[in-house]
Amino acid sequence: MPNNRQPRPAARDENPGSLLADPINLRILAELGRNPRIAMSELGRRVGLSAPAVTERAQRLERCGVIAGYRLELDPAALGYPVSAYVRVRPGPGQLRRIAELAASIPEVTECYRITGEDCFIMRVYAPAIDEFEAVLDKFLLYGQTTSSIVQSAAVRPRSLPLPAAPPPAR
């Protein structure tokens, strides 16, 4: 069963492109995308390999960086965080680094990205209530301007990226 360990750095002789050219590896990735907790024996059965062979392939995909990790998805509302928002931040002069540090220090900020455009950061914030969301925003207002958008519903839930097409079989 896949675990949450961090993948090892890519070995010099492993090329993500060559691994992705293999249709069996693409099938492994598709199955893991549907169910990251699948047992290696079941994964092997689905792609036509033994458990040790499919385990080795999955580990190679991890080592070369194609598989970046396995993640647990939690329901924020079930954990007491029904308020979800995206917040854009435009730092004041000289405050760029401080915004990134502040975002990293606030547990309710679950993602923060440096972006192009008028704002410099976009982040995902969860809170138990609007007043607590406002308290998070107030921390950023010390260092710049914020623009927030409360999430009403998810039109598309997080999902795996599309995989490259399998190459045609060699003749």
Tell me what each language-model feature is:
Residues 1-171:
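A compositional/biophysical signature of low hydrophobicity enriched in polar/charged and small residues
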